[in-house]
Curated annotation (Swiss-Prot):
Pathway: Membrane lipid metabolism; glycerophospholipid metabolism. It catalyses: sn-glycerol 1-phosphate + all-trans-heptaprenyl diphosphate = 3-heptaprenyl-sn-glycero-1-phosphate + diphosphate. InterPro entries: GGGP/HepGP_synthase_I, GGGP/HepGP_synthase_sf, GGGP_HepGP_synthase. Disulfide bonds: none annotated. This is Heptaprenylglyceryl phosphate synthase. Sn-glycerol 1-phosphate binds at K12, Y159, L160, E161, Y162, S163, G164, G189, G209, N210. Belongs to the GGGP/HepGP synthase family. Group I subfamily. The gene is pcrB. Homodimer. Keywords: Lipid biosynthesis, Lipid metabolism, Magnesium, Metal-binding, Phospholipid biosynthesis, Phospholipid metabolism, Transferase. Pfam families: PcrB. Prenyltransferase that catalyzes in vivo the transfer of the heptaprenyl moiety of heptaprenyl pyrophosphate (HepPP; 35 carbon atoms) to the C3 hydroxyl of sn-glycerol-1-phosphate (G1P), producing heptaprenylglyceryl phosphate (HepGP). This reaction is an ether-bond-formation step in the biosynthesis of archaea-type G1P-based membrane lipids found in Bacillales. Its cofactor is Mg(2+).
Amino acid sequence: MYDISGWKHVFKLDPNKELSDEHLEMICESGTDAVIVGGSDGVTIDNVLHMLVSIRRYAVPCVLEVSNVEAITPGFDFYYIPSVLNSRKVEWVTGVHHEALKEFGDIMDWDEIFMEGYCVLNPEAKVAQLTDAKCDVTEDDVIAYARLADKLLRLPIFYLEYSGTYGDVELVKNVKAQLKQAKLYYGGGISNAEQAKEMAQHADTVVVGNIIYDDIKAALKTVKAVKGE
């Protein structure tokens, strides 16, 4: 079994986006610590299975970040369950999770499941609109969400999600200083190695996503930038 606490760099692949076999191989053989499969819309059992089968040709750990209960399938190493802490809708905090546990609770392998406390900070992002996230927040608000995840809920992951725009480095630094046991994931807007390296100075794990589809070479360079190799 893999130890997620040591992951510094992960790629996130959207099953609803096209990725050539050649580029998928580059991603999986890049030296990244893991590949997360997940997206905000268009996630189906068919495209998740296609992605799983494709990734399983390689040795890299793979994680399903669950956004659609109907698209859950066995075969992933881990399952990340996001709870959007700054959502205005309870369904995205605990509601969907409650329904899933009613249906699948008896067959879930809890050693494979990790809850993520999300704080979504880009109001233009699909995930913000889908979950009705309250993005007009102060640094004190974000730190309070971090403490909620880390100290009250004891979640293993606190995820700062800027999704599509590069985040506030000073905020990321200050959030990291508040966390005692939760790992800080950062995702959003990383388009080059320099940005990846900058965020890696503060976040435990840097998530690289959209740039995969825009500039594969730039995406691959983020691995060494983050891991210092």
